[in-house]
């Protein structure tokens, strides 16, 4: 029986050089991925929330909004850094389309993020003041109209949305729910108030047709109807409140903004010397909504020494790895968050099933 040695191929220099170039090109080529990692939390109980010409109370403790650092939508990500980040776990690596709408231009994404933050300041103030029993007037206006929307032919940026299909709009979520059960191609009657040349408001009512949402699809991949309008919020509040924050976008600071306002406007000591962090969107009525990057935000909170983390209950399926020493309190409303903060340290809140 003979031993047969395997054949050994010797690649010529041109072939080797070609594969070297191919490998190098792959590592240096931009690819459609993004990184995100925990951001540094911002302290709300310092000068971030400023109450003007109204009595405030000393704050005993620290309250933080949390954030994530995400690759900008127009920033290139290269193959080599993607492989390294994935291998060592320095950052979470995700396909770009998992975070940013694939058809939305980078400048629109960034503008929308800033608009969401501005709206969050209004809705959090509304939620906090409503919780404290103050009355005020809320207004919702068109802040942008998408090119794919036929509303562009009938309405203008700055129009105040007053009615949809004959129903008076009292809260921003009523705008979204007004067409949630409708289909693409269905009509929608919208009434707005528009300021004329004399500075007077005129009521304008017109019909639009629901179009396919070109930025978001349903979880099952089916197409979602849209009016193609971005809505901003403003209000005439009895208390003047400013937010001194830059470089943070999106709506996820709303819940903690609202808690911070309540902490400053009331004598009650909710923080009791603790470091409390959290996240969550909020509606003017105090409903708390889910956000992205919850685990990265918990890590950021843990790094600055927070012992309590307030999170949206809707995010419970995403809360799996809780940092040591961090008590996570899931809530559905602002009122639940306040009740949880009032409770003694020995109190064990109803936790997420999988945490």
What are the residue ranges of the model-derived segments?
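PDZ/PDZ-like peptide-tail recognition elements
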Residues: 40-73, 93-146, 214-238, 242-247, ...
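Glycine- and Gly-Pro-enriched alpha-helical subdomains that act as flexible
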Residues: 264, 276, 284-309
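N-terminal Lys/Arg-rich, disordered targeting/topogenic segments
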Residues: 1-12
């Amino acid at each position: 029986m003979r031993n047969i040695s395997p054949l050994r191929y010797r690649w010529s220099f041109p072939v080797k050089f070609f594969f070297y170039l191919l490998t190098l090109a792959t590592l240096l080529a931009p690819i459609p991925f993004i990184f995100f990692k925990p951001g540094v939390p911002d302290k709300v109980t310092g000068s971030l929330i400023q109450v003007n010409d109204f009595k405030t109370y000393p704050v005993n403790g620290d309250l933080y909004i949390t954030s994530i650092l995400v690759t900008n939508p127009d920033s290139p990500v290269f193959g080599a850094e993607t492989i390294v980040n994935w291998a060592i776990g320095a950052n979470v690596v995700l396909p770009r389309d998992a975070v940013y709408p694939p058809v939305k231009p980078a400048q629109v994404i960034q503008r929308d993020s800033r608009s969401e933050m501005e709206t969050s300041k209004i809705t959090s103030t509304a939620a906090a003041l409503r919780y404290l029993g103050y009355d005020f007037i809320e207004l919702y206006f068109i802040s942008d109209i998408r090119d794919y929307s036929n509303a562009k032919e009938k309405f203008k940026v700055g129009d105040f949305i007053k009615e949809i299909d004959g129903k008076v709009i009292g809260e921003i979520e009523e705008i979204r729910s007004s067409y949630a059960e409708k289909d693409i191609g269905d009509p929608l009657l919208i009434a707005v108030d528009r300021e004329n040349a004399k500075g007077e408001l005129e009521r304008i009512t017109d019909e639009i047709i629901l179009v396919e949402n070109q930025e978001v699809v349903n979880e099952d991949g089916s197409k979602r109807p849209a009016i193609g309008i971005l809505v901003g919020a403003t209000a005439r509040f009895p208390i003047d409140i400013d937010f001194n924050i830059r470089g943070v976008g999106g709506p996820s600071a709303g819940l903690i903004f609202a808690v911070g306002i309540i902490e400053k406007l009331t004598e009650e000591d909710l923080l009791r010397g603790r470091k409390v962090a959290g996240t969550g969107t909020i509606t003017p009525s105090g409903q708390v909504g889910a956000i992205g990057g919850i685990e990265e935000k918990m890590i950021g909170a843990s790094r600055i020494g927070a012992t309590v983390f307030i999170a949206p209950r809707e995010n419970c399926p995403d809360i799996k790895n809780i940092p040591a020493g961090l008590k996570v309190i899931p809530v559905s409303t602002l009122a639940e968050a306040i009740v949880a903060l009032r409770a003694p340290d020995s109190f064990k809140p109803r936790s997420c099933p999988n945490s």
